[in-house]
Amino acid sequence: MTLTSITAYRESDVEQNADSDFTSADLIGRNYNKTNIETFTQEVRLTSSGEGPIDWMVGGFYFDETVAIDNEFFFGSDFRGYADFLSGGALAAVEGALSLPVGLVFAQEGQGMVEEFGQDNTAWSVFGTLDWHMTDRVTATLGLNYTEDEKDAYGNIVNTDVFSSLDLVAIGFAQALGGFGVDATDPAQVAAFAGANPGAFAAIQAGAQDPASNPLLGLQALQFLPPFLGFPNSVEDGQSSDNDLTYTFRLAYDATDNLNLYASYGTGFKATSWNLSRDSRPFASDFTAGSPVTSPGSSPIRDAGLAVPNLTSGTRYAGPEEARVIEVGAKFAYDAFAFNVAYFDQVIEGFQSNVFTGTGFALANAGKQSTQGLEVDASWNVTDELLLTFAGTFQDPVYDEFPNSASGDLSGKAPSGISDTTTSTSATYTFDVNTLEAFIRADWQYESPTAYFDDPANQALIGNQREVNTWNASAGFTTENGLGVTFWGRNIFDDDYVTVAFPSVAQAGSLSGYPSQPATYGVTVRKSF
């Protein structure tokens, strides 16, 4: 038997300040992030000696990680002018109506959010595999893994964006009541009016929520940074605890000395993932959204007196996801040729989806996501000098059930960013020039068109799909004393596409993206000692 122990400690510190409005205007003056991640892991394995018809391995794994995130997000010097332009000067009108200094309160430089998020995550698992060599050509494999995962998460934000803190429904409600001589800040006057005029009061409540009656509601789109309800709190404990038993079964058969056939069935598990961003929101089961003046009804957070203006429901976390994968394949090798092919059928229940919305990230579970397809890879040494390779994945991914995504009901639609066809093809020719070992290589990377967004509205804005059709080439040599020189070209035919697209920060109806790397050429020199 062999005992193996692996102990690891890793620490990662990231500090950055991004110009995240991606314009020449100073709209977002500061988008600073500092993230610290400290991770400790311990793994122990005991493996059999390999004698006899049964091989086995048992082990355990421990994981302890702490994440601390500090963010600062402030408006820049041009943000007020930008907001005035979008609103047609309405911000100044609201400031005047509220008897505030005009031009000096809303959307000011330096207003924004100071954020603090983090989590402590501990997990452990015990696992084992057993290979039973039933005959010289048939092997059955069984694997088991039991995991427990616990997380303690937190999030707090100090918000200085005055305009986003306004309850525009309540302001419209107060203005309407004021027309009847009722002071909306006096509960006694409001109750007396409602009792004496129930029909008129109901109409005022309804009108406060109707943009046709309350024009202030048209400004809600400019409330980019609404107040945040920190957690844990008296209703939300910020904790999750998950456990699961996963397993794998595999049967392999050496049909000949050159051909192996196999079939496997496996399950997988991913624990709860917390949304550690400003878009974290209470679940609908904990909070019923709505301005207090509209009588939204009872909910745990409102009843506990925790509700803040403009709070909406959403998700604090995505619950566990569970996967099932069936694979049937063959591996063939003969002389200078090798060919592998596998059919796979994967289903993920509760797929954890994370989508950037322009001001934060929406984390939610899809009911079910699946994909079926083929994986193929082959290599052929045509001669001693020439090697050809090919690898490809051909699949049909779909959201089987995703009725409550951040982009509406996506059930039956293909997920964005996943190509139906992905291939990699290469040719390498090696040869000697006197004492030099030289080579010439070319490769082609292809990914079929796929949508940038799950959201149909954003996809319609960008107007095209992501497709990759990139050629690379290189040539080089190595000397007897270990000096290597490689001349290379990447994307030599200048394939032009957007690698990633996303909603622009605080600019509804606009999109941003990162372009592909243009044709690039260079030389790499290395020395082995």
What residue ranges belong to the model's regions?
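Transmembrane beta-barrel strands of outer-membrane/channel proteins
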Residues: T7-Y9, V58-D64, L142-E148, A263-T267, ...
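C-terminal beta-signal and adjacent terminal beta-strands/loops
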Residues: F73-F74, R80, E385, Q445-A457, ...
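Membrane-embedded beta-barrel scaffold of Gram-negative outer-membrane proteins
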Residues: T2-A8, D13-S20, D254-G266, K270, ...
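Outer-membrane beta-barrel transmembrane strands
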Residues: M1-R10, E15-A18, N33-E51, M57-A68, ...
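Gram-negative outer-membrane beta-barrel transporters
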Residues: W56, D136, A336-A338, Y343-I348, ...
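Gram-negative outer-membrane beta-barrel proteins
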Residues: E11-N17, D64-E72, E148-N156, D257, ...
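Outer-envelope beta-barrel architecture signal
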Residues: M1, V44, G52-W56, D136-A140, ...
